[in-house]
């Protein structure tokens, strides 16, 4: 029978949870720029679970906490798979496991109502992070769980791995034991943040040991017991993965590099989910959505951004250029090597889980509360799948902030064909068609979908023939840009670059970053001068305005003219822009 005290306590809990739900919904609405982003988020992530005390007409009066329930379950699981009880003492990190091939073929003993959306969080130099920052990171982890994300934490031990190279086994075991104590201290700190709350609002974490093993006939470590991870995350508990692996050869435990651990997690979890999809009509058991690197150095630095971080990195297009830039010499060797390590590791991980995103930020930024004044880039990226600012915003504008967070995706390749002739005679479209570099059907399709109109291709090609300055194609025509040479009516006519078509397919609009990737590439190829026109009532004009040096209304028309580039146009030049905007005839059917 419920007492008055129980009832009052649960009313308080109900009010707090109701307020938390309200605040979470407001966070989503305030952080997402479009209805599409809200829909995409809610479609992917299960929002706060119903914790109403009136659900099912009764209250859960279990005196066993969620963590204790989990501890019992996991201990039983470990015992079940152990064949030698002597190796299961708490001081020993090795668990005798069943054969990997049998485990991989067995059915996972977990049934979920929602797909788990996993974020793997790597924290570098966690011992040097002050307790206040750790508490802030704990609240970010808590917020992620409430937003439907399942974090897995790895405390980076790469320094230990390097320092122990060539040391005795006894020294390695001593270091592993020391790491164990530090990991428990980390768990204790983040859990203490929530001791003032009831059980349903606590943040629980669990040390996960004995997860990795290298067999005699294998050249890499593998995850032999996925339940060790999936049971806690399915209950909203944060697994803290030990970077320790057992080697059959030599029967010993060794420290693993963060790269080895993360690649093992990414590869083995993906393989497990792929097998699940085969047996369950392509339904996902879980997906890896984010790789979050919390690093004192922050995001990957950019010279263009005055050594602040790249906002967004499209690996398939930018990786080699960024690596080359990091070797120019504007960074200390140690810093450069760490940034390269982060970039290279994320490139490898995103080759395995191609739809995931990487986030590299600092502990101070990772602990930010999501408020009207501050934007936590981790929370914001979960809600929108975008960086906090657009990567195509001009760097030199005062309103464009310099950040220390990089969002990294495998992205899309960008094919760029630019007229490099001295007389600006234009690209030879026939040559591009014969080489298979240009597909007119796909080109027309993406333009039609983007503009919601029917392009008269014959009429359009007749107008731009011998005048095409550039064609940029993102991926498999997820987006295209066509730039033409247009002649001014000045006393000495000149050909200038005019952005004629900028189209992004509806599926690629928003969080994919295709528009930003294309526009950045466009500006890098036409950095001196570029202009374009847009209908005065075009909702995209705000986006254009933020990326242009200026805009003017073309008198007597419904056109707005935008311009950008290093060369500031004279009054006569602007008149030339206006004349071109007025005389170009649309090439639409109907």
Swiss-Prot record:
Q: What GO MF annotations does this protein's record show?
A: L-glutamate N-acetyltransferase activity
**InterPro entries referenced in this protein's UniProt entry, alphabetically:** GlcNAc_Synth_fun, Vertebrate-like_GNAT_dom
Q: What is its EC number?
A: 2.3.1.1
* Catalytic activity of the protein: L-glutamate + acetyl-CoA = N-acetyl-L-glutamate + CoA + H(+)
Q: Which residues form the N-acetyltransferase domain?
A: 427-587
Keywords, sorted A to Z: Acyltransferase, Amino-acid biosynthesis, Mitochondrion, Transferase, Transit peptide
| Coiled-coil stretches noted in the UniProt entry, renumbered to this chain | none
A Pfam match is NAT
Q: Which GO terms describe its biological process?
A: L-arginine biosynthetic process; ornithine biosynthetic process
Q: GO cellular-component terms in the record?
A: mitochondrial matrix
Subcellular location per UniProt equals:
Mitochondrion
What pathway is it annotated to?
Amino-acid biosynthesis; L-arginine biosynthesis; N(2)-acetyl-L-ornithine from L-glutamate: step 1/4
Please report which protein family the annotation says this sequence is part of. Belongs to the acetyltransferase family.
Functional description taken from the UniProt entry = N-acetylglutamate synthase involved in arginine biosynthesis.
Which named protein is this?
Amino-acid acetyltransferase, mitochondrial
Can you name the source organism?
A: Komagataella pastoris
Q: What is the lineage of its organism?
A: Eukaryota, Fungi, Dikarya, Ascomycota, Saccharomycotina
């Amino acid at each position: 029978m419920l007492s008055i005290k129980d009832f009052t306590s649960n009313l308080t809990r109900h009010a707090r949870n109701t307020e938390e739900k309200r605040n979470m919904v407001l966070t989503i609405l305030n952080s997402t720029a479009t209805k599409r982003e809200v829909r995409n988020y809610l479609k992917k992530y299960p929002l706060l679970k119903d914790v109403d005390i009136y659900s099912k007409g009764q209250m859960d009066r279990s005196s066993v906490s969620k963590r204790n329930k989990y501890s019992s379950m996991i201990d039983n699981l470990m015992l079940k798979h152990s064949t030698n009880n002597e190796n299961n003492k708490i001081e020993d990190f090795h668990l005798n496991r069943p054969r990997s091939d049998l485990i991989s073929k067995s059915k996972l003993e977990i049934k979920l109502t929602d797909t788990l959306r996993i974020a793997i969080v790597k924290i570098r130099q966690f011992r040097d992070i002050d307790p206040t920052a750790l508490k802030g990171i704990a609240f970010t982890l808590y917020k992620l769980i409430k937003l439907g994300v399942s974090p897995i934490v790895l405390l980076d031990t790469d320094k230990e791995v390097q320092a122990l190279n060539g040391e005795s086994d006894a020294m390695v075991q001593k270091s592993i034991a020391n790491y164990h104590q530090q990991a428990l201290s980390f768990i204790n700190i983040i859990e203490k943040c929530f001791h003032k709350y009831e059980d349903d609002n606590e943040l629980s974490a669990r040390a996960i040991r004995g997860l990795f093993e290298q067999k005699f006939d294998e050249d890499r470590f593998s995850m032999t017991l996925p339940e060790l991870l999936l049971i806690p995350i399915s209950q909203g508990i944060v697994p803290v993965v030990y970077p320790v692996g057992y080697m059959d050869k030599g029967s010993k435990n060794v420290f693993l590099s963060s790269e080895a651990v993360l690649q093992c997690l990414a590869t083995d979890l993906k393989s497990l989910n792929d097998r699940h999809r085969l047996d369950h009509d392509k339904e996902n058991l879980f997906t890896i959505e984010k790789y979050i690197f919390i690093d004192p150095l922050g995001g990957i630095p950019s010279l263009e951004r005055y050594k602040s971080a790249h906002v967004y990195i499209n690996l398939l297009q930018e990786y080699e250029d960024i690596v080359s830039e990091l070797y120019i010499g504007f960074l200390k060797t140690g810093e450069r090597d760490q940034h390269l390590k982060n970039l290279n590791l994320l490139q490898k991980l995103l080759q395995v889980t191609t739809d995931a995103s990487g986030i590299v930020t600092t502990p101070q930024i990772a602990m930010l509360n999501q408020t009207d004044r501050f934007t936590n880039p981790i929370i914001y990226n979960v809600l929108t799948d975008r960086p906090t600012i657009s990567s195509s915003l001009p760097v030199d504008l005062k309103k464009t902030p310099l950040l220390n967070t990089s969002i990294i995706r495998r992205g899309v390749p960008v094919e760029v064909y630019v007229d490099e002739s001295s007389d600006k005679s234009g690209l030879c479209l026939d040559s591009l068609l014969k080489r298979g570099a240009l597909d007119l059907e796909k080109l027309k399709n993406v333009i039609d979908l983007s503009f919601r109109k029917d392009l008269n291709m014959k009429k359009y090609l007749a107008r731009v023939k011998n005048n095409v300055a550039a064609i940029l194609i993102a991926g498999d025509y997820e987006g295209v840009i066509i730039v033409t040479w247009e002649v001014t009516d000045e006393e000495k006519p000149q050909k200038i670059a005019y952005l004629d078509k900028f189209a992004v397919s509806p599926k690629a609009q928003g969080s994919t970053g295709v528009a930003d990737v294309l526009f950045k590439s466009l500006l890098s190829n036409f950095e001196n001068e570029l202009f374009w026109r847009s209908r005065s009532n075009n909702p995209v004009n705000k986006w254009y305005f933020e990326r242009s040096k200026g805009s003017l209304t073309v008198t007597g028309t419904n056109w707005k003219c935008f311009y950008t580039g290093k060369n500031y146009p004279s009054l006569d030049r602007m008149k030339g822009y206006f004349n071109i905007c007025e005389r170009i005839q649309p090439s639409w059917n109907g």
